[in-house]
Amino acid sequence: MTEDFLPINGTDYVELYVGNAKQSALYYQYAFGFELIAYAGPETGVKDRASYVLKQEKIRLVLTSPLSSDHPINAHIKQHGDGVKVLALWVDDAEKSWKETTSRGAVSVEAPKTLQDQNGEVRVASIQTYGDTIHTFVERKNYQGLFLPGYQARKSSFTTQEIGLKYIDHCVGNVALGEMNRWVNFYEEVMGFKLLLTFDDKDISTEYSALMSKVVSNGNGYIKFPINEPAEGKKKSQIEEYLDFYGGPGVQHIAIATYDIIHTVGELRKRGVEFLEVPSSYYDDLLDRVGKIDEDLQPLKELNILVDRDEEGYLLQIFTKPVQDRPTLFFEIIQRKGATSFGKGNFKALFESIEREQQLRGNL
């Protein structure tokens, strides 16, 4: 067994750069059941931006907006729209993580530094990954505060209701044609990840378009990053649409785990979150395809939840429509009942569903 030179304890937080963090924070609190726990902005001594930290179980989302027109974050928003900037990784030693990765070829975004306040200190360091996305290593073993130094505790202005979201299962990146293997190699060689699964254009294709995907995972399996690229097809694939509207590579979706997907999706739908729809015929022979499952078929059909089985068990999953006007970032809700895979049996149904949405937008 080779030593894991980059031990990661899990996802620390995901930061989105957005046009209006105050309004985005309200959306994620109301619709997704997150709770506001901390804030940084002019009132806390941060003059150039406002950041809201939202939490549910083990998930932390940070929503950040710039406060001036010439702020660098504005250039990011102008190019990409609202999108994921930081996939932060919780580590025991930020400096070692940064040294190990930069010595293997990672591009440094920020050298190790210490953030301090009355609750202790946090060490952070950042490297570049695909597009304008970065990984920040966060070492918080000497910190007792709510989030990071510079943030103050802040509570939601209304009573939020959790909907059963537990932790981030995986985060998916979209890269340009011919770039997937480059980034898989980056994660393998620079970050010590292992290739978990490969899907080619025969696995993920429709009459019109196709994509290819490889999944990399860190040593303990807590961090999983599928990476997609478009494949040759008759028409524009969903990955090409994303790349066009995002203005380059970036995070396509964040998959969040629940232990009761029927409850979670029921709540999301009640609060106005829109999901991709599959035809009702998907359910006609579902049990023949996946075998016995614990759930009743009727609520799955009503909520449009998909099911797939692998050697280890089965999973239930559903995908939101994009959560902003550009057809870019969306969320997946997933419940694993033993399955360790990613729903290969649903790829075709999902892809066709996305193409129907693309058609409506005039982008197919």
Segments from the language model and where they lie:
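N-terminal beta-strand motif that seeds the catalytic metal site of vicinal oxygen chelate
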Residues: M1-K22, V84-L87, Q144-V184, G247-I256, ...
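Core segments of cupin and vicinal oxygen chelate
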Residues: L6-N9, E15-R60, S103, P112-Q118, ...
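Vicinal oxygen chelate
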Residues: N9-G19, Y52-V53, P72-E100, R104, ...
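Extended catalytic-interface subdomain
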Residues: S65, D82-L87, K96-E207, M212-K214, ...
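Active-site-adjacent "gating/activation" loops or surface patches in catalytic cores
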Residues: N220-E241
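Long, C-terminal catalytic modules of enzymes
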Residues: E311-L315, R326-K337, S341-L350, I354-L364
